[in-house]
Amino acid sequence: MSDYSQLDKYVEPDLEKMALIEDVRPMMKLESSYIEMNDYDFNYDQVEYKQCREVASVKSIKICPKCKKRFDAVENFCPDCLVTLKYPQDMDSIKGIEINSKIEFKGSGNSSNILTDDNIELICNFDFTIDDFNDIVHSIKAQGFKNLDNAIKDNSIDLDSLNILDKVLLFAKAFVSVEYKSYGEDLGYFQFNKIYVDDRQRKSLQITTLIHELSHFLLKEFLVHTTCKILDVNKNRHVEAVIIYILSNSSFNSLIDEYAAHSVEGRFTIFGYQDYSSFTAIQKDLDSEHVDIAKTIGNTFAIYIKELLEGFLDWDLREDIKTQFLKDTTESPDYRQLQLENCNKLSDEGFIKAIWLILSEGFQNCNIEVVKRYMEEF
């Protein structure tokens, strides 16, 4: 493994995350706190009151399925289209809508053999800056939002009429394909440019699963586009297969990836309810120093992912997610695992060095046969 200790001098505190955790620190020593629920009336404890707003009453409406005009619930027909009005929840589901979620990178070539000595040398020399990385994040965000805009127009979607799960689902599908599974114990997973979600679960868990798995996709895209930029090639399945290999065949890189997704998910859920098992199993394979720096790198990736997501998941939608979470849960929060959180990030210079270490070591140690098998999945 590369010497990641050289990144120690670039570590700095993530003040925003520290402040969020500091708000609940007094609760970490308590065994539990109880949330009493009765339909839409919530009695929040001190922490939940800070994190959630009260549910606002929403006027009941109906929508014309043809022109999408909104009517009071007492109306039955659209006078212009002469069709029966429907309640928003009875409209065609976002689940069944096909969206073009293509995210591209345009280079000057389309090499079918990425793992050449010349390319490995280019990766190791790493002519890449933080400005290049910011351009990549902006490009991915712009393409995703264009896909979202096209989907809304092509399907005449009324965003205001969607529930919070459908809004998050629509946003996720603008970046990556989403499919549903009805077996296994996992809430969901990301694999070869597809997110799989168990739709038997509560809405709140489907929402956080979508955010978690979308984060895996975006981190993968960051590294794919970085590689394409350095090698000056179009995005293709060869590059994607190499990056999937790098992220999945090293406990260190897997922890970076998993902790990043965990940290992003935590931005949109409620402290005390998040599942930590996604990364605790991985970190058992690493010593404490490698665990700390892997989490710091993952947390830095998470900052960029969160900023991208917050372009759509603004304050109001984040509060809607938290409110949905409280409506669904009957469990008491457990703050003890917050001690596993990492509140550090890397400076710009340190972050670029971290990406260099990940890619240079990964390219040099790639198993070509495994990469070929991965290529067949795209």
Question: What are these regions, as identified by a protein language model?
Answer:
Residues 203-219:
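Short alpha-helix carrying the canonical HExxH Zn2+-binding catalytic motif
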Residues 64, 78-81:
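Short cysteine-rich clusters marking metal-coordination/redox-active sites
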Residues 254-269:
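An active-site-proximal "capping" alpha-helix that borders the catalytic cofactor pocket
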Residues 61, 75:
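Residues immediately within or flanking Cys/His clusters that coordinate Zn2+
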Residues 103, 115-195, 200-203, 374-378:
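Auxiliary, metal-adjacent structural segments of Zn-dependent hydrolase domains
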Residues 204, 220-256:
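Post-HEXXH active-site segment of zinc metalloproteases
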Residues 82-92:
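Short Cys/His-rich micro-motifs in 6-15 aa windows
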